[in-house]
Amino acid sequence: MMAKNKEPRPPSYTISIVGLSGTEKDKGNCGVGKSCLCNRFVRSKADEYYPEHTSVLSTIDFGGRVVNNDHFLYWGDIIQNSEDGVECKIHVIEQTEFIDDQTFLPHRSTNLQPYIKRAAASKLQSAEKLMYICTDQLGLEQDFEQKQMPEGKLNVDGFLLCIDVSQGCNRKFDDQLKFVNNLFVQLSKSKKPVIIAATKCDECVDHYLREVQAFASNKKNLLVVETSARFNVNIETCFTALVQMLDKTRSKPKIIPYLDAYKTQRQLVVTATDKFEKLVQTVRDYHATWKTVSNKLKNHPDYEEYINLEGTRKARNTFSKHIEQLKQEHIRKRREEYINTLPRAFNTLLPNLEEIEHLNWSEALKLMEKRADFQLCFVVLEKTPWDETDHIDKINDRRIPFDLLSTLEAEKVYQNHVQHLISEKRRVEMKEKFKKTLEKIQFISPGQPWEEVMCFVMEDEAYKYITEADSKEVYGRHQREIVEKAKEEFQEMLFEHSELFYDLDLNATPSSDKMSEIHTVLSEEPRYKALQKLAPDRESLLLKHIGFVYHPTKETCLSGQNCTDIKVEQLLASSLLQLDHGRLRLYHDSTNIDKVNLFILGKDGLAQELANEIRTQSTDDEYALDGKIYELDLRPVDAKSPYFLSQLWTAAFKPHGCFCVFNSIESLSFIGEFIGKIRTEASQIRKDKYMANLPFTLILANQRDSISKNLPILRHQGQQLANKLQCPFVDVPAGTYPRKFNETQIKQALRGVLESVKHNLDVVSPIPANKDLSEADLRIVMCAMCGDPFSVDLILSPFLDSHSCSAAQAGQNNSLMLDKIIGEKRRRIQITILSYHSSIGVRKDELVHGYILVYSAKRKASMGMLRAFLSEVQDTIPVQLVAVTDSQADFFENEAIKELMTEGEHIATEITAKFTALYSLSQYHRQTEVFTLFFSDVLEKKNMIENSYLSDNTRESTHQSEDVFLPSPRDCFPYNNYPDSDDDTEAPPPYSPIGDDVQLLPTPSDRSRYRLDLEGNEYPIHSTPNCHDHERNHKVPPPIKPKPVVPKTNVKKLDPNLLKTIEAGIGKNPRKQTSRVPLAHPEDMDPSDNYAEPIDTIFKQKGYSDEIYVVPDDSQNRIKIRNSFVNNTQGDEENGFSDRTSKSHGERRPSKYKYKSKTLFSKAKSYYRRTHSDASDDEAFTTSKTKRKGRHRGSEEDPLLSPVETWKGGIDNPAITSDQELDDKKMKKKTHKVKEDKKQKKKTKNFNPPTRRNWESNYFGMPLQDLVTAEKPIPLFVEKCVEFIEDTGLCTEGLYRVSGNKTDQDNIQKQFDQDHNINLVSMEVTVNAVAGALKAFFADLPDPLIPYSLHPELLEAAKIPDKTERLHALKEIVKKFHPVNYDVFRYVITHLNRVSQQHKINLMTADNLSICFWPTLMRPDFENREFLSTTKIHQSVVETFIQQCQFFFYNGEIVETTNIVAPPPPSNPGQLVEPMVPLQLPPPLQPQLIQPQLQTDPLGII
């Protein structure tokens, strides 16, 4: 039972491998491969296969347990699976013969039989014999696997006879074959199966193999298997075949030829190798080790398979090769990277062609090593070559190994670098040459495409040399330059036309009429036309300029950081801070004065005499003054001394003042000259700020002869010099004194010095003063234009270099304070320096006592801005004009500068202002005395200016003004009184081109600052809260929709009828004090949000017209209408005139400077005339009583109420003046009308209206013939509009009658200008807008669609009574149309006919359509008064064309309709056309066709 339950054991076979063995003499120097065959079969893995097995053993090894004193080896057993799935165990025995390593004879064994007999033994026995693995096992059995031969004995079942078929081993094959033959005979006796294994077939000799096969063929059932233990070919086949012969149940053995078996085995190896190499390829780091990688891969089947087939050694070799490849690849990449970096390094170290053009490679290397940046580009390694150092692993170090430069590659890169520099130099030269070529081509305009220019430069040498990309790049750069220049010139042009923009106050919005006026004026300028191809950019610049004009801020100033406001704030912040620091040091040095240091300056011993006199009045150099004792240190200085200046610059002596004594004109001149030297040197070389602020006192010495005639002259000249130097003057007291100097003189002079020092201490005292720093007797505004070609410190240096300059109140960053002696007192003057755009808000809103207007004589725009600003300044405010240029020579050498300087002087002469020139290259610009006369003039007019401001403020009590000044109550602090002198304030002469260097602004003088006031009055009128910035720099209100105002009545002078008319208008719209909204009738208010949207088919109400400007509700300038001219004794300042009641009371109303200057007035007037030059009185629509509103705001610039030519008729009542030019014009018109022939009146005059467009177009406004072709006789724009209307809006109510949005109409035409393939549907515009754009197209044509020449014939044909005859006559006339006009006219009339067919829905009958379209198609002459009686006939002609469209153009039948000439009104009162039919007035024109009649202007304003 137990035996049955046991699993059957697999059959076991013992196979003995035999073959040639013995000594070297017998078998040669190598065996036949028996051991390799056994090794490969038992342990087939490559790592377990040992190719060397020796048979020469020591006695010890031979006696070991492995050999066990036997001449056979036990190789162990192996379980083999057959193809049938049957397992069997095979024990392998190798019969060999071991040789003693000492005697080289076979070892003695228990079996003494020869090898042939031993090998044929079928029973083997050896107790405890161990399995053999390899030669290294002998003696180290414990280190290897120990497996005993089963039971110490085995029975051999078959034999495997090995025959070596390879060449070599010092063995004859025939001897081997004989040995094999004998052995086979012995084996045959055992009756065991035998198979021949031909070994070493990988080195096979074919002849040997054939002999073996021949040997086997002679034997019965003897098989030959070709094997190779090295490549593991057919090894297993040998044993399998033998087992099959032993096991009869198995199939007959199948022997595979060696080549086939070899291919199969190699295929396995190749496949395994590929898979293994793919595994190895996953390793990308060449630093990886085999140990790490093999541990990761050991469980991978592909790895295991390759190890089994090829072994670990080959696997490691494969891995090492891969790692080496990775490293070499890394080095190659680094080398490429270095080589690619070399050009950049060369560009850095050797950028100049001149340096290296003639250097060889070695010289260039030495030059590079000397460069400072060498270490940044290259690294010198201690070990070379670089690719064998660790530098290759420093990925972050991009520096190039210097030894790399020794390669040929690096030298080649250097040569290429030199050639590149040469070619680049040539390319740059050619590009610049091409650039100059482009600059010479005058017709290249900004925005012109390259394709239009390319054909003109094809033959240019430079163009041929450079590439197309370079050509485009150079042209692009040239375009950018000329575009930028054109834009700058365009911007400059806009500033030059400042009068065109600055005639409206801030925060207003320009209307469409104003925009048309601007375009009309500017379109004549070449700089405007220069940007014709960049119309959108030009429009953007214009809108940006307009936006800045009406909403100016320093942040949006067009000059950017060069804005005058920004520059002034920066300069004052730094300069005044330095002044304060200097004075602070002076304060600390001068507190608690007990000792007074004085210089005494004189000539011919006068200084010493005065010093002696003072010492005479002193006791031990101590002087008693006003109850206090002062120690005096006197330093007399003779003006003639050569060491004069060196005596002043001593660190030990710090003077508190200087007494300047004189007794003659000569000595006084010396004093003036040397005081100038002292101040100039102290200011220029900045040796001592103390000396720059030194107070001077002029002292007149008494004459020995008291009746000297020179004394009055000396007194007068001394006072003049004192005023100029802004210092006290001590006169000789009345009476007769025997000595030159009087005690009262010395005391007065000492008091002056002490008070000057005390004043300086008050100015810089760190202790808060009780007096408000903002107190000022005069407030002066200095205006300068942003971007003028001079620095701000140039025009501020007269003030900043003055000893009397100080900072204004905190928060006023653009103001400073001056203390100056004006007249008899020291006055405090606040100077506010602003840009012109910031000054505009000040001009109207703030109390300003005077303006200093600075302009550059090199820049027309600067003068234009000055004119625009000055025109609106009240003529009661004194003005000082300052022209700035480099030197006086500019006047003679530059005509433009001469013209601008002459114009400035001329304007100053006309308005009785002061003018001077400032030369930046002259030191005289640092003088301050040039403004003394201006300040005196301002002081004289101060009360009048403030009263005018007060009255204006009272009239505008509801107006909230903003102040850049921060006024506060003021008190009177008397300082010094001086003798009166009529000529004290004599100023330098005005600018004269033939005089010496004009002294506008002086050298620095004493900086003592005084706190004096003239009036001591308070100004509650204009006090405002403290603010850091004027609010106008921050408020930008949104656009306000326009509100019409009451129009002015057309009168010629202020007569009683005018007064009644105005009073009647005021009665309807009484002024309310609490209202800030301009007066208007309710029905005149525009409900549309779009201020520019007119209605082109409805007449404006009679008596009203389009506004040129639209003023928002909160504008600072509102239109004021007085309730009565008689009762209102305090008239409106803005009217610019005094009414008769005011005049009778002796009060002169202030006007504007533009009415005092013919130059200023003519400039503004010329703009208006240029804009409206194409519209005479006769060209206006005569039946319309509407009158164009003046350009000027409200009544402030009402030409009826403003002085025009004050140089002719005075300014108090300018209305009585007449314009001789207009009177002559009217007389000529009357004479011309009397002589006019009646026939000429009947002739039709071409009416060419101004275009409604404000942009350049190459389509709209072109002749019709230029827009069509024979293939496309209809203009594309007309087709698109008609198709859009018929597809989307044929049933729109009021089509062609209701006006579309003008902005949309303009956009449609602009978009079409840019792209003729536009899709109107995608633009999302209304049908009415497209209809309006279509009408505008025909209105802009140079000639009407219905030719003027056929108008009389159409008129005559329309009068024919018989309908049929009338229609045929009209048809014949239509055939006379030009073919182009005929095609388009037919297309349009057909379209209108389709519209009229939907009249029940769109309410547009043929009659209504004709009313809307006939003025557009016929362009009538409205100036012909006889035309008014025929307007209905013209309309009926167009109506007939629409109704009888089929008859006229398509040979259709006549349609029966009502009376064409005078159709009755429709019976349906609800239709829109009802109010249009009975009108006997001509139908409305499109807006662009209406030219309002310009009424006669008696004052010549327009």
From Swiss-Prot:
Does the record bear Membrane in its keywords? yes
Where is the stretch described as Disordered?
Answer: 975-1004, 1022-1050, 1069-1089, 1125-1156, 1168-1254
| Name of the protein in its database record | Rho GTPase-activating protein 5
Q: Which residues carry this modification: Phosphoserine?
A: S590, S765, S951, S968, S1115, S1173, S1176, S1195, S1202, S1218
Gene Ontology cellular component? cytoplasm; cytosol; endoplasmic reticulum; plasma membrane
Q: Which gene encodes it?
A: ARHGAP5
Q: Where is the composition biased (Basic and acidic residues)?
A: 1140-1150
UniProt remark on domains = The pG1 pseudoGTPase domain does not bind GTP.
Q: In this protein, which residues make up the domain named pG2 pseudoGTPase?
A: 779-944
Tissue specificity annotation: Detected in skin fibroblasts (at protein level).
**PROSITE patterns, per the entry:** FF (PS51676), PG1 (PS51852), PG2 (PS51853), RHOGAP (PS50238)
| UniProt KW Transcription keyword | no
Q: Which residues form the pG1 pseudoGTPase domain?
A: 590-763
Identify the residues that the record assigns to the FF domain, covering every copy.
267-325, 366-420, 427-481, 482-548
Keywords carried by this UniProt record: Cell membrane, Cytoplasm, GTPase activation, Membrane, Nitration, Phosphoprotein, Repeat
Against CDD domains, the record matches this protein to:
pseudoGTPaseD_p190RhoGAP-B, RhoGAP_p190
Which part of the chain is the Rho-GAP domain? Answer: 1262-1449
Lineage of source species: Eukaryota, Metazoa, Chordata, Craniata, Vertebrata
Its chief place of residence is: cytoplasm
Instruction: Cite a single GO BP annotation.
Output: regulation of cell size
Modified positions (3'-nitrotyrosine) are Y550
Superkingdom, taxonomy of origin: Eukaryota
